[in-house]
């Protein structure tokens, strides 16, 4: 198959001391609010690897639990996961700190501003706009949304992150 041929080719590159991208073994995540909980989906583009994970702070090993279905969270956790073939770790370890606060996993109501689940999924966006944890709008957009906390709550602080990535024409709000 193609993947086995690529693995064989990569072995030749490694034997010659040529560094090649191993990102095909890295894990991508999607965290979405579901009925007051967070659903954490882990995936690798390589179907021939095993995803192993921990939620106790330890580094995953080939003996860690095998990821077979989405994880459901009801509190703050740090998920660590990596891909394995046998006992060998192949990609970088994913370390995913999931934050829990009054808004986590609560519904976001909006009028035409797109899918805003990232506002309450417990994940802070990284410095990479491409991590899919950012909402984006154009300068001409009017953005309104409501976080439904389900009951009256005293809110002392509201934190909303923003990012600047000039190379991708992503800029912080002007106002």
Locate each region found by the language model:
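Short coil-to-beta strand junction motifs in C2/discoidin
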Residues: 168-175
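Short, compositionally stereotyped local motifs that mark structural "simplifiers"
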Residues: 3-144, 163-166
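Extracellular and analogous surface-interaction loops
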Residues: 144-156
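A short beta-strand element within beta-rich, extracytoplasmic domains
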Residues: 153-167
